[in-house]
Amino acid sequence: MTNRFLILFSVTIVSVLSSAAQIPITFKNNWMYVDASFSYGDKSFPISAMIDTGCTYCVIDSTFAVDSCGITPQNPDYNGYNTSRDRTRIFYTTIPILCVGGKEFTEVKCAIIDLSGKFQTNHRFIIGADILSKELWKFNLKSCILECLDKNSSLSYKSIITWDKRSALFYNGIVLKAKVNGKKAFFLFDTGSRYNQLPKEVGILPTDTIVKEFANIATPIVWKNRERVQAAQFSLSSINLPIDFLLTNESIGYLNVEFLLDRAFIIDYTKKRVLLVE
């Protein structure tokens, strides 16, 4: 009886720990958000954090950081770049502990940026590639669940997306080579990008023009008239589907998470690959 109780107790504990590591994902404007928390001083702050593979470090909104958290910015003379290569001044701080899905990350470097003033959204915190690269993360976009996997576990998957050898603008950036309407194109996998964008140099003609709002860490929100390719046939590994693209003058385009909706995938920074589970 005692042994049976211990076995049942162990199974219950494992089940609880496993479920605790699963975090619900919510979507807004093609952006993914998860619940997290961080500590600063003697206080803990719960946050809804956006997941951004196109951002090197974590980011905290400046108003929230200073007024609500009492954070003092450091390194005010650091000059940084956004994904569009616009230069901007960035302040940094170090967060003692960041908790995401039952995982604790210590001494987290964090940029302090006016997110609400530039993006006109409720972004308070962004989880960047610095944190994402430290673990194996499984994104199940069918059930909208994020899970941190054991690095030593056996991974089951159906196909692989290998990162291209081209260097991204920033450390831990993910560059993918795909085909659009049968033509080769390179993209930065940027879950923080609101739109999918295709380089004009690929040679695909636009189907129409549309007015869209744009913003980044260097510039506030503006409205732009942009050429668009509607329902372009996108192919990458085992993925084949129509996607709308805005055209860009940059040599590398942008892919947000849209091409992975209704799928489950694992981002493996160590082996530079994305594993398609479903």
Positions of PLM-derived features:
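Pepsin/retropepsin-fold aspartyl endopeptidases
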Residues: A20-E278
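Bacterial Sec-dependent N-terminal signal peptides
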Residues: M1-P24
